[in-house]
Swiss-Prot record:
Site (Cleavage): R140, R141
Tissue-specificity statement: Expressed by the liver.
Protein name according to UniProt: Antihemorrhagic factor BJ46a
Residues of this chain annotated as glycosylated in UniProt: N95, N204, N282, N293
Cystatin fetuin-A-type domain ranges (all copies): 22-130, 141-254
Intrachain S-S bonds: C28-C332, C85-C96, C110-C129, C143-C146, C205-C217, C230-C253
Main location: secreted
Keyword Secreted on entry: yes
InterPro entries: Cystatin_dom (IPR000010), Cystatin_Fetuin_A (IPR025760), Cystatin_sf (IPR046350), Kininogen_Fetuin_HRG (IPR050735), Prot_inh_fetuin_CS (IPR001363)
GO biological process: negative regulation of proteolysis
Family: Belongs to the fetuin family.
Length: 341
């Protein structure tokens, strides 16, 4: 009898929680709105192929509407901010530091649709995002000497990454790493320097083979992929057009040990097979499928995100994310968790 009473109470609790979550009059700062948002942000971060994880900044709007039978649709408009955690970093986004404004911050606006079945608790998520760096004018207005973002394929950025990685490999006797992705480059002043961030992967070849154009190196696949992430500053003492030779530099490379089964472990091969230059910001990705163009700059660039296969849903679902369900509602937008660009 006690077990039966406990089961009934549990059912009432679940039912009460669920009815709260699927009601249509949620305000942006309510707990239930935050739970839907967490689902959307987690999905976005798990399916980004390049760059950094993003953290919630503002819930701009939330609408929950009945859809078809046991389904409800949750429409979210979110403003996110770039963190300092690369997408391959297993650190939970809640523990990642949001990139501060003086370090040329980047924001991302996302339209998210969550299809939720109130009977089976299954869900399907769609997202459409575009990211934009803070303007150079804003950065310089608030901090005239702060470093400015450069395109990831800027020659000085690429040369600085190669210089630091070569120095890193020279110190290792049994391990050789290759650039997986250049994710950030910035020009610093007084003294003049280039700041870079890039991901590296251990490969199955020697240092000599690494520099042989006829030899193809591949990531190690034994149990774990040894992924690293480097932050480095190269102080330029030679003419700006020359490659680094004997420059002073500061670097910090950490090994992430991305284990098999991690949300991004299957993306490593995709990184290696593509150009190592990270796609930049400021283009739209619908359902996380978008071609990329590496000639763009930090201010006219784009995301390239993982393709998400059609999930368990048997009925027809909308392919787009309509604006007709995202009109402003009471209590929105919500509070700003960090800062506005």
């Amino acid at each position: 009898m006690n077990s039966l009473v406990a089961l009934v109470l549990l059912g009432q609790i679940i039912g009460s929680t669920l009815s709260s979550q699927v009601r249509g009059d949620l305000e942006c700062d309510e707990k239930d709105a935050k739970e839907w948002t967490d689902t959307g942000v987690r999905y976005i971060n798990e399916h980004k192929l390049h760059g950094y994880k993003y953290a919630l900044n503002v819930i701009k709007n939330i609408v929950v509407v009945p859809w078809d039978g046991d389904w409800v649709a949750v429409f979210l408009k979110l403003n996110l901010l770039e963190t300092e955690c690369h997408v391959l970093d297993p650190t939970p986004v809640k523990n990642c530091t949001v990139r501060p404004q003086h370090n040329h911050a980047v924001e991302m606006d996302c339209d998210v649709k969550i299809m939720f079945n109130v009977d089976t608790f299954k869900e399907d998520v769609f997202a459409k995002c575009h990211s934009t760096p803070d303007s150079v004018e804003n950065v310089r207005r608030n901090c005239p000497k702060c470093p400015i973002l450069l395109p990831s394929n800027n020659p000085q950025v690429v040369d600085s990454v190669e210089y630091v990685l070569n120095k890193h490999n020279e110190k290792l006797s049994d391990h050789v790493y290759e650039v997986l992705e250049i994710s950030r480059g910035q020009h610093k002043y007084e003294p003049e320097a280039y700041y870079v961030e890039f991901a590296i992967v251990e490969v199955n070849c020697t240092a000599q083979e690494l520099h042989d154009d006829h030899h193809h190196c591949h990531p190690n696949t034994a149990g774990e992929d040894h992924i690293g992430f480097c932050r480095a500053t190269v102080f330029r003492s030679h003419a700006s057009l020359e490659k680094p030779k004997d420059e002073q530099f500061e670097s910090d490379c950490v090994i992430l040990h991305v284990k098999e089964g991690h949300a991004h472990s299957h993306l490593i091969q995709q990184h290696v097979e593509k150009d190592s230059i990270s796609p930049e910001h400021n283009n739209t990705a619908l359902n996380f499928v978008h071609p990329h163009n590496d000639t763009s700059t930090s201010h006219e660039s784009h995301e390239h995100l993982a393709e998400v296969p059609v999930a368990f849903v048997k009925k027809e679902l909308p392919k787009d994310i309509s604006d007709r369900h995202t009109t402003p509602v009471k209590g929105c937008p919500g509070k700003v968790h960090h800062f506005e660009l």
